[in-house]
Design a protein with these regions (language model features):
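PLP-dependent enzyme catalytic core of the Aspartate aminotransferase-like
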Residues: 78, 119, 128, 146, ...
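Active-site beta-loop-alpha junctions enriched in small/polar residues
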Residues: 156, 185-187, 322, 348, ...
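Short hydrophobic/aromatic beta-strand micro-patches
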Residues: 222, 344-346, 406-408
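Conserved small-domain helix->loop->beta segment predominantly found in fold-type I
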Residues: 271-274, 278-280, 285, 289, ...
Length: 426
């Protein structure tokens, strides 16, 4: 279906015809743990990857399969894997790339959970990370070592929506024979497609814009199918014969789907962060309206940024749409249709004023999620980024007076009136 446009692909890929078993037009929920093989040879072929198809519910499911095909198509990738959460998608990606004590170079202004994973959890398993200012290309390239296995970025940093120059960083990664991993959760394939700018692997917390309604946890890994893992010799778990899977080389067996197939067949098999069929179904409902929602998110965000930038009780608005933002040129280059509906602003005062503002909002919900159709708010320094010390907070551009907003799809006049209520309380 590659000839179709995004808005059509988000509705049809993976189920181009009615369901063959039931003639259902909607994607059915295949609520089963296992699948009957036609005969013994059929079973052996499935387990040997000679025949693509369902083996066991921990690895694959027909509802999940539609979600994977659809996200691969929307991102322009060769294959995808859906998982139980975005955290699982990121963890499996790093583990697959940096097994046996590898090293990662990562943008320092990333989601607090990803920062903790890379800075504190994975080092206990021999995987270490150097965090860099992604705007300083010399610093980024200088952090690459002999055992570096990937460069990791977010298209829009969390929580300040700062933007790395993906084209330039992809060039550095490939110069050193490394894949570029991009978390496109906030960008979404509707607004930005990392593979078109040199990325090799894309991850998502599908919980956010993909699902869009705050109902369902999920994660996605998509690969471009273009990175040659055999040539570099740095990824033997994918390119060399794998002793835990009949000596198969995933690279030789499935080529452009080798990366996600390795994760499915080995890491998911052994550690089981499986997405449920019902969760896959709910995420598919979100995918079908992705473009429509993102247009409204972007439209509302533009008006809220304009409102906040002129408000006397606001010290600073951290949004790349503003001409004085250091990433404004990159925003215009990579996000011509708008975006960055998750961003921060600094209120005049400190934590007390920030809390008072938040506690007097009505439409905005105080919770840890983002990218919902409902508008959301939180105080990062005391919640999502509370594990960071003051130096780490400052490195990520977060102060005690910083407030994160996630702009929803409500009527813009109601959103702005609610923000005014918060300001009136301080």
């Amino acid at each position: 279906m590659s000839e179709y446009r995004f808005e059509t692909l988000q509705l049809h890929v993976g189920q181009e015809q009615a369901d063959p078993a039931t003639d259902a037009r909607a994607v059915p929920i295949y609520q089963t743990t296992s699948y009957v093989f036609h005969n013994s040879k059929h079973a052996a072929d499935r387990f040997g990857l000679a025949d693509a198809g369902n083996i066991y519910g921990r690895l694959t499911n027909s509802t999940q399969d539609v979600l994977e095909k659809r996200l691969a198509a929307l991102e322009g990738g060769s294959a995808a894997l859906a998982l139980a959460s975005g955290a699982a998608a990121i963890t499996y990606t790093i583990q697959a790339l940096a097994a046996n004590g590898g090293h990662i170079v990562a943008q320092k202004t990333i989601y607090g959970g990803s920062y903790n994973l890379l800075a504190h959890t994975l080092p206990q398993y021999g995987i270490n990370t150097t965090f860099v200012d992604a705007h300083n290309l010399a610093e980024l390239e200088g952090a690459i070592k002999e055992d570096t296995r990937a460069i990791y970025l977010e298209t829009l940093g969390n929580p300040n929506s700062d933007i790395p120059d993906v084209d330039a960083i992809a060039e550095i990664a490939h110069k050193h024979g490394l894949p570029l991993v991009v978390d496109n959760t906030f960008g979404t394939p509707y607004l930005f497609r990392p593979f078109e700018h040199g990325a090799d692997i894309v991850v998502h917390s599908a919980t956010k814009f993909i699902g869009g309604h705050g109902t369902t946890l999920g994660g996605i890994i998509v690969e471009s199918g273009k990175f040659d893992r055999k040539a570099s010799g740095k990824y033997p778990n994918i390119a060399a014969p794998n002793p835990s899977y009949h000596g198969i080389s995933f690279y030789d067996a499935v080529g452009p789907a080798a990366f996600v197939t390795f994760i499915r067949a080995i890491l998911l098999r052994d550690t089981g962060a499986t997405i449920s069929p019902f969760s896959a179904f709910l995420l598919l409902q979100g995918v079908e309206t992705l473009s429509l929602r993102l247009e409204r998110h972007a439209e509302n965000t533009k008006k809220v940024v304009d409102f906040l930038s002129k408000h006397p009780k606001v010290e600073k608005v951290n949004h790349p749409a503003l001409a004085d933002h250091p990433d404004h040129a990159l925003y215009q280059k990579y996000f011509p249709n708008g975006g960055a509906s998750i961003f921060t602003f600094n209120i005049k005062g400190g934590q007390e004023e920030a809390w008072k503002f938040i506690d007097n909002l009505s439409i905005f919900s105080l919770l840890a999620n983002v990218a919902d159709v409902k508008s959301l708010v939180i105080h990062p320094a005391s919640t999502t980024h509370s594990q960071l010390n003051d130096e780490e907070l400052a490195d990520q551009g977060i102060g005690r007076n910083t407030i994160r907003l996630s702009i929803g799809t409500e009527h813009i006049d109601d959103i702005i009136a609610d923000l005014e209520k918060g300001f009136a309380a301080i």
